[in-house]
């Protein structure tokens, strides 16, 4: 069995010189968490398996993303780095990989132009093409009311999950599970799946969503949104069947350092690199 991955996520606001890492709740209530290069270096030294940088305002502001931050980070960080935000065309993938990133993540641009996934995977390979999906629950009364939605049973009823774009500012009407399956068919190598309902809440990942994605895809699924303690990551791997777990708050604010999380998972029988 492949080892599960622990991935700290750095949500970056580049409206200040050199950028800053921030964290919100349900994509709102933003607070400052630290310097991106310093945090990435700390997580690398702590044993993170990968690091994700998300430029949270690049797509909304229609600008390019953080090449200078990635260049500075890769001078001292030697684990895979994934960059998202402001990736709009195949050349952007090439530019970020040249700056030192190993993967690029797209959300808004891929939904606006699905052919981007095909073009990027042809240019840099599927392993470098991650599609980020920010999904929000949409409850329904009758699970049979729509053949166009992938209906999922959750604790308090039935719902489908709608994709959002522009950092959660706009909704698309697109079913998240069906969109992920299309992304896989187009050449995406991985899905970064964020529950908007759980983001920053520390209530745990959205397990029904994560499990449904994992069971319907052949490519890896990264669970994101809601982790508050190591038990939540364990649940993402066991109940949610995720291949990797992304977290922010518990690492940024020193609630649970990466080594402690990994040791906990190892003690519970999860295959993990220490």
UniProtKB/Swiss-Prot annotation:
What Pfam families has UniProt attached to this entry? His_biosynth
Alphabetical GO biological process terms: L-histidine biosynthetic process
Asked if the keyword Lyase belongs to this entry, the reply reads yes
Subcellular location per the Swiss-Prot or TrEMBL entry? Cytoplasm
Principal localization reads: cytoplasm
Q: What is its EC number?
A: 4.3.2.10
Picking any one GO molecular function of the record gives: lyase activity
Q: Which UniProt keywords apply?
A: Amino-acid biosynthesis, Cytoplasm, Histidine biosynthesis, Lyase
Q: Name one GO cellular component term.
A: cytoplasm
Reaction(s) the record says it catalyses: 5-[(5-phospho-1-deoxy-D-ribulos-1-ylimino)methylamino]-1-(5-phospho-beta-D-ribosyl)imidazole-4-carboxamide + L-glutamine = D-erythro-1-(imidazol-4-yl)glycerol 3-phosphate + 5-amino-1-(5-phospho-beta-D-ribosyl)imidazole-4-carboxamide + L-glutamate + H(+)
Q: Looking at the keywords, is Lyase present?
A: yes
Q: Which InterPro entries match?
A: Aldolase_TIM (IPR013785), His_biosynth (IPR006062), HisF (IPR004651), IGPS_HisA/HisF (IPR050064), RibuloseP-bd_barrel (IPR011060)
Q: Tell me the pathway.
A: Amino-acid biosynthesis; L-histidine biosynthesis; L-histidine from 5-phospho-alpha-D-ribose 1-diphosphate: step 5/9
Q: Which family does it belong to?
A: Belongs to the HisA/HisF family.
Quaternary structure annotation from Swiss-Prot or TrEMBL: Heterodimer of HisH and HisF.
Q: What does this protein do?
A: IGPS catalyzes the conversion of PRFAR and glutamine to IGP, AICAR and glutamate. The HisF subunit catalyzes the cyclization activity that produces IGP and AICAR from PRFAR using the ammonia provided by the HisH subunit.
State what protein this is by name: Imidazole glycerol phosphate synthase subunit HisF
